[in-house]
Curated annotation (Swiss-Prot):
Belongs to the NADH:flavin oxidoreductase/NADH oxidase family. This is Probable flavin mononucleotide-dependent alkene reductase. FMN binds at residues 30-32, 63, 105, 238, 303, 324-325. Disruption phenotype: Knockout parasites show reduced replication within macrophages, but are resistant to bicyclic nitro-drugs including delamanid and DNDI-VL-2098. Sensitivity to bicyclic nitro-drugs is fully restored on expression of this reductase. The active site is at 191 (proton donor). Keywords: Cytoplasm, Flavoprotein, FMN, NAD, NADP, Oxidoreductase. One of its GO terms (cellular component) is cytosol.
């Protein structure tokens, strides 16, 4: 055994996730890559991409759209009709054939959606009529390739909120039909659920706004509906209490984190995935708040080096660590970690382009 493998030995231990053992503590982060076809059906390139990374203890897919005609990203995957189910089945079969485990991240963008990606007659929605103003939609995410401002979204009525809860549950059922081992509910990074959670984007005065309990109401209605649809052992949740991406902030992120964790303790889901900090600042600590409060399986991530991840797992600060760009650029990340081999460097210029370049051409050792 190499010195490198000894230092990360704890990362190679199996872990029970929802009653199912995963082979190691390396988790592939949900990474938007925009490689699905025009109808949001997974492509052959996606089959290869995910199956090449089957040695990760758990794969979590890219954010996968739950609603027809509401595309947050051009060429994102969808999970709202049979065509998507059939397409994802090819991915899950390929991952399972290599002994891997894969969850589908189910997602809606809310106000963080490119206007030109939304079908005629479909409204861009959010908890409140508050637009993103800190940046514009990147052309790489748009069907028409044009950079454009975010519009003021439509503030959802109570009956619309209920309809979105149903969309998440339907997407979860479709994911299981497609062969996924479970789903991760996307409650992070300024998308629809996170917009309800944070004070910067939720200015409601009804039962879905104001107090932490009210701002979390939509999250737990979604989570409970998904649990009812597919079983708690197949459900994970991702949150990003400190991340300012998409104009997000909260008046008391620690209290928000602790409340979410206290409520999750009553539900015994498969895992909680907490992004520890902010994309744009050194702020860190959300994982520590979660570990102090949450009694279940805890994943954390955001710019971890491999030995740092091993120390986090060894100390009990996390049960597994989520890797983004390292998994993106290294299909054999686990083997490289064991060997102490150098890692491929990711190419940001190809993160959101279509085709194989920067997607399936990163070499194995």
């Amino acid at each position: 055994m190499s010195a490198a493998s000894k230092s990360i030995d704890v990362m190679l231990k199996p872990l029970l996730v929802g009653g199912r053992p995963i082979s190691n503590r390396f988790v592939m982060a949900p990474l938007t890559r925009c490689r699905a076809d025009d109808n949001h059906v997974p492509t052959a390139a996606m089959v290869k991409h995910y199956s090449d990374r089957a040695s990760m203890g758990l794969i979590i897919t890219e954010a996968t759209q739950i609603q027809k005609g509401y595309s947050t990203f051009a060429h994102e995957g969808g999970i709202y009709d049979k065509e998507h189910v059939d397409g994802w089945r090819k991915v899950t079969d390929a991952v399972h054939d290599k002994g891997g485990i894969i969850f589908c991240q189910i997602h809606n963008g809310g106000r963080s959606t490119v206007p030109s990606n939304v079908d005629e007659g479909v409204r861009i929605v959010a908890p409140s009529a508050v637009a993103i103003t800190g940046h514009k939609c990147a052309g790489s995410f748009a069907r028409n390739g044009k950079t454009q401002p975010y519009p003021v979204p439509h503030a959802m009525a109570a009956e619309e909120i209920a309809s979105y809860v149903n969309l998440y549950a339907a997407a979860a059922r479709n994911a299981i039909a497609a062969g996924f081992d479970g789903v991760e509910v996307h409650g992070a990074n300024g998308y629809l659920i996170d917009q309800f959670l944070k004070t910067s984007s939720n200015q409601r005065t009804d039962e879905y706004g104001g107090s932490i309990e009210n701002r979390c109401r939509f999250l737990f209605e979604v989570l409970d509906a998904v649990i009812q649809a597919i079983g708690r052992e197949r459900v994970g949740l991702r949150i990003s209490p400190l991340n300012s991406f998409n104009d997000q902030s909260d008046e008391d992120p620690q209290a928000l984190t602790r409340y979410i964790c206290s409520q999750l303790n009553l539900r015994t889901i498969a895992f909680l995935d907490v992004m520890r900090g902010d994309f744009f600042s050194p702020a860190r600590g959300a994982d520590k708040w979660a570990r102090e409060e949450y009694e279940g399986v805890l994943f954390t991530g955001m710019s971890f080096e491999i030995e740092e991840a091993a120390k986090a797992v060894e100390s009990g600060a996390a049960d597994a660590v989520v890797f983004g760009t390292k998994a993106l650029a290294n299909p054999d990340l686990v083997a490289r970690a064991v060997a102490g081999a150098p890692l491929n460097k990711p190419d940001p210029a190809t993160f959101y382009t279509t085709g194989e370049a920067g997607y399936n051409d990163y070499p194995f050792m």
